[in-house]
Structure formats: C-alpha cells, structure tokens
C-alpha cells in the first residue's frame, strides 16, 4: 500500500485521501455553522460556511486527523493499559516528522503522531502498545521485544507498514 509522504493535495472534489487505511474522496460543501469534516463510507466531506483557502483546508484536515487519533488512541490506551498492568500519564497527539510515537518513562506520558489516522487502525494499535510496553521496559532490549511478542504477536506486520514510509 502506498502512502503519500508529501502534502501536494489540492482538496478538489473527487481527490483521494487516506483515512484509517482506506481511500476516500473529498467533497466540498457549504453549510451553516463552524468548519468541520464529516467522514462517510465513501467521502470525506469538508463543510464550511464559505470558501476557504487550501492552507485552511490543510489545517482543518490536519486537526481532524489529530482528533481521530486522539479518540481512537485513548480508547486503545484504555483497552491495553489494564492488560499490560501499566498506568499511563497523558496522551498527546501531534504531527511529527520522524517518529510515530514516544513515551516519557518519567511522566508516563505518551505522544502519538497524528498522521497515523491515514493508516489502518492496527498500525495505531501497534504504536500504542509499543509505547505502553516502554513503561515496563524503557529500552529496545530483548525483553522489550519479548513483551511485544507476548502482547501483540502481529506487531511486526504493522511495523513493516510504517517502516515503508
């Protein structure tokens, strides 16, 4: 599966964007209220009360991706923390250039890349579990990978998908 590295999208109707590993087409609509994005099975609707610039559409979509990752990431943390018997700190979501996630083992805070909303949810699950496992084993030691194998046996497939970028 090919994922775009560059942001050369123009946000015209019919243009394809990735959401949770699926290609969906953009539709631009005018509507009352605040600017928003609505995801259907086939479309990513950008709804605005008036015409907005390309930069504004990029920011709107970037914020929407971050919110999606925040929601699903929090659900995954709530699901996995008891399984791993860890107590994570706060979840931070932001666009990152060189990492998919990080864990501060002192504060137990987890930081996740908002771009993960473009990949299948299994990739986000892999990153969440990876960062939570760091609360048990801070380094990428043999023990760390043994814990990953124990809790998420298919983690290598997700890692390969993310490493291909």
Write out the residue ranges for each language-model feature.
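Walker B catalytic acidic pair
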Residues: 131
């Amino acid at each position: 599966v090919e994922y775009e590295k560059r942001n050369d999208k123009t946000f015209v109707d019919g243009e394809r964007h990735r959401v949770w590993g699926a290609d969906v087409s953009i539709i631009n609509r005018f509507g009352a209220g605040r600017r928003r994005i609505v995801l259907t099975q086939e479309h990513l609707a950008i709804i605005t009360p008036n015409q907005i610039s390309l930069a504004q559409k990029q920011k709107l979509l970037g914020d929407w991706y971050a919110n999606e990752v925040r929601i699903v990431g929090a659900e995954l943390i709530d699901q996995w923390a008891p399984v791993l018997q860890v107590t994570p700190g706060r979840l931070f979501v932001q666009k990152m250039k060189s990492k998919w996630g990080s864990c501060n083992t002192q504060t137990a805070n987890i930081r996740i890349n908002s771009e993960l909303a473009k990949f299948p949810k299994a990739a986000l699950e892999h990153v969440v579990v990876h960062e939570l496992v760091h609360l048990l084993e801070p380094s990428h030691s043999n023990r760390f990978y043994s814990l990953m194998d124990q809790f998420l046996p298919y983690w290598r497939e997700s890692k390969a998908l993310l490493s291909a970028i």
